[in-house]
Amino acid sequence: MHITSADEAIAEALRVIGDAQPRCGATTVVAIDGPSGAGKTDFAAALAERLPDAYVLHMDDMYAGWDGLEQAVTDLHDQVLAPIARGERAEYRRWDWEHDRYAQWRTLPTTPLLLVEGVGSGAGRGADLESVLIWLEADREVRFQRGVERDGEAFLPHWQRWAVQEDALFLADATRVRANLIINTSP
């Protein structure tokens, strides 16, 4: 299903999530994926406001810098989703973007609903443990402008490097094709 209206998108996502069955132990995992600047973080926040039992995990906390996309996809499965599926504690090492190094370990609370938002959240081996995949997209120029507004001038040197990683991941994984919902966030 392709959606463009924000209210319609939230309503449809809530419907799909409500119908979903857990595939990660007792936890229903919702991946909110798509390229940078598509609006995944804002969309996850809007869903979380309406889903009080949900915990939001941001992939930005898992990327080991600007070249860490592929490793973060693996870490999402190995450190978060697989342990949850086994009924174990999930924890991951947060990336400190300011100091360009790993920071403290974070432990996820036990939750019936986990929203994982960010590039790569619906890719890789973790996809088998996710109940819902929501894909957000926007025109490249719109996404670029949002990225600059969000991250400032510091983002510019990294935009193309990151975009190459995104494109390779999404092509190899066919992430968009597997989505339960596709939402275009372009104005």
Identify the residue ranges that each predicted region occupies:
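Extreme N-terminal, non-catalytic leader segments
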Residues: 1-29
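Conserved lysine of the Walker
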Residues: 40
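ATP-dependent NMP and nucleoside kinases share a basic, alpha-helical "lid"
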Residues: 104-151
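P-loop (Walker A) phosphate-binding loop of NTP-binding proteins
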Residues: 35
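Conserved nucleotide-sensing/catalytic segment adjacent to the nucleotide-binding pocket
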Residues: 55-57, 62-114
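Hydrophobic positions on the alpha1 helix immediately C-terminal to the Walker A/P-loop
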Residues: 43
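Hydrophobic anchor at the beta1->P-loop junction of P-loop NTPases
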Residues: 32
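Small-molecule kinase domains that catalyze NTP-dependent phosphoryl transfer to phosphate-bearing small molecules
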Residues: 101, 105, 123, 152-187
